[in-house]
Every structure is written in C-alpha cells, then in structure tokens.
Amino acid sequence: MTVKLTIDCMGGDHGPSVTVPAAVKFVRSHPDAHLMLVGIESAIRAQLKKCKALDEPALSVVPAAEVVAMDDPVEVALRKKKDSSMRVALNHVKEGEAQACISAGNTGALMAVSRYVLKTLPGIERPAIAFALPNPTGYTMMLDLGANVDCEPQHLLQFAEMGHALVAALEGKERPTIGLLNIGEEVIKGNETIKRAGELLRASTLNFRGNVEGNDIYKGTVDVIVCDGFVGNVALKTSEGLAQMLADIIKEEFSRSLLSKLMALLALPVLLRFKKRVDHRQYNGAALLGLRSLVIKSHGSADAYAFEWAIKRGYDAVKNGVLERLSRAMAENAAPLGESGRDADGAGQASPSAGQPAEPSAALSSKT
C-alpha cells in the first residue's frame, strides 16, 4: 500500500528550505511513500532543484497561492486565506487524496482550519495535541501540548478519554492509568479548574490515579498525563531546552583540555548514544487527536532533520491504522460527554466557536 501524505511546505519558521529537503530525504528511504508538496510552486521547485529531486516520482507539487504566517490570527487563516498551503493540504486529505497532513504552521490556525475542514470525531468537543514522551520503560502519552490554552474541567476529562482510547488502541492495555498534571499530588492543590477536573476524573470509569507533578512526566508514573495546552506546551519546551543545555554542557566539558578530549574519544560510543537519546528533534511531530483524519503538527522551529521525523510520525500512524484503532477504541471504551457542539464558552486557542466551526467568523481572533 502506498502511503500518501500532504506536506504544508510553507508552514513553520523556515518554510520550503526545511520542509522540501526533509520530504526528499524521507521518500528516498521509504519507497512506499508518496508526498504531495503543497505551497508556492516556484519556491518548492527551487528547493527540489537544490536537492536534485525535480524528477523524483514519489513527490508531486500542488500549487497554493497563499501562506498562513506564524503570527496570523485564526480569523485570517479561516476567512481570508482559503488558498493557503495549509488549507489546500487539508482539503486533499478531506477528499481522500491523501491519508494524513503534516504541517509546521501556526498552531492555532492549524487546529481551527483542521476542525473546519476535517471535522472532529463524534462526541469530541476539542481536539488536543498528543505525543508519546519517553520514559525508562516505554512512553507516557501527554495531552494537550498546545492546542487549547484555556480549558474547562469537562475538556480535561475528554482529553483523558482520548488518551485512554489511544493507549488502549496502540498498546492493547484495557485500563491505561491516567494522571492529572498539577502542582502537587494532594486533591486540595491546583486552581478550581484542576480541582473540578479531578472530581470528574474520579467519578469517571477511567483508571485515574490522581494528580501527578512535573517530575513524573519522564518517570513513567502513569500511562497518560492530562493538562491544558498552555501548561503542556511550557512543560514540553522546558524539557527540550533542558536536554539541549545538558548536551551543550557535556560537549563543553569534554573540549576543555587535551586530556578531556582524549577521554571524550574513549567515551565516544557512550556520548553518541546519549546525544541521540536527548536529541529532542527525533521526538518532533505530534498528532492532533480527535479529528476525523490524521494531522501531524511539527514544531515551527524544526530543522530538516526534525521535520523528517514529523513526516515519519504521519507515515507510521497511517501504516499502523492509528485513526481507525482510535475511533474503534473511543466507541468501545470511552464515555463521551455528549455530542460535539456542547462547548459554548469560547475558551481555547484553536477556535472560540463550539464544536465544529460552521463558517469562519469575524469573532475568531486568537493567535499562536
């Protein structure tokens, strides 16, 4: 089976100078993949020429006249840029011409446009960015990592249901353990939203283990960690910054003297393994969980190596039938809060409208 993916080539801080080389390298190592490169045709072809890939049969160029900038408000992406690379890439997924979309674009815009074009799964009010973070024995699924800055307690419960369904689908665990990210383990800790979310989780049928703290994220304390997108994004980027700092410190210390350089040479295999394990770029690419089709969000600052990993996330998700397994697990195991469209509070980064965005509205004004 050929895995067909659309690439929003104009998204991110670097656009085609990163996305196109990453796509070229990916298809050369994955013969069963076909990537549709969406964006300004001249810019894409210029990069293909640099990569000596103008005639690469596994790549096709899909023109799009507009670009969603990283600082564009959501209303601009939805109402004014209907021929953007982001929108066109998602449209091809909607029409069944591709099985997933990968974008490094503006998070708020990507979430809102994805909801509008692709719609959410039944019972899902807000999609969330979910990613598997490494721990000593495997991984911990964490969500939301940036899609919804402000959440109500019922949204956190629904994130837990989606995380439960995803881990159940991928790992075969009947009752994955759930933790709520907080400033302490005690039930009295946290703001009112967190306290109320804890009450809802304890009253649910989920295997809720209570509050977890930031130092539990990489311990493997629970299978799924739930938080709002503001907290999750800060936690993720703090971790990436720490990993980079540790790698820089080790490099600096082993470069101080001739003796330390000789020691580094002896320790090179260990250092290379360490570098690989802490290189956050290989963890780039997170799923927008809760949509009816697959969308993978890359870091906006990703380089070509990191963006290639995001493409791989989409490729693997298609090959492993993640969407189908998630949908089935949600239907079998989760207890949805109600039909999509109940959310009327307007909170969140992706879109202030409830449920599925019916039509782009002038009221949409959030930025990422």
Curated annotation (Swiss-Prot):
The Gene Ontology biological process annotation of the record reads:
fatty acid biosynthetic process; phospholipid biosynthetic process
Q: What's this chain's function? A: Catalyzes the reversible formation of acyl-phosphate (acyl-PO(4)) from acyl-[acyl-carrier-protein] (acyl-ACP). This enzyme utilizes acyl-ACP as fatty acyl donor, but not acyl-CoA.
Classification via InterPro entries: FA_synthesis, Phospholipid_synth_PlsX-like
Listed as disulfide-bonded, the cysteine pairs are none
Coarsely, its chief localization is cytoplasm
Annotated NCBIfam families: plsX
What UniProt keywords apply to this chain's record, in alphabetical order?
A: Cytoplasm, Lipid biosynthesis, Lipid metabolism, Phospholipid biosynthesis, Phospholipid metabolism, Transferase
Q: Which Pfam families match?
A: FA_synthesis
> What do the Gene Ontology cellular component annotations say?
cytoplasm
User: Which pathway does this chain act in?
Assistant: Lipid metabolism; phospholipid metabolism
Q: Where in the cell is it found?
A: Cytoplasm
Q: Which family does it belong to?
A: Belongs to the PlsX family.
**Per the UniProt record, which EC number(s) apply here?**
2.3.1.274
Q: What is this protein called?
A: Phosphate acyltransferase
User: Which residue ranges does UniProt annotate as crossing the membrane?
Assistant: none
Q: Where is this region: Disordered?
A: 334-368
Record GO terms (molecular function): phosphate:acyl-[acyl carrier protein] acyltransferase activity
Q: How does it assemble?
A: Homodimer. Probably interacts with PlsY.
Query: Is this entry keyworded Iron?
Result: no
Q: Which reaction does it catalyse?
A: a fatty acyl-[ACP] + phosphate = an acyl phosphate + holo-[ACP]
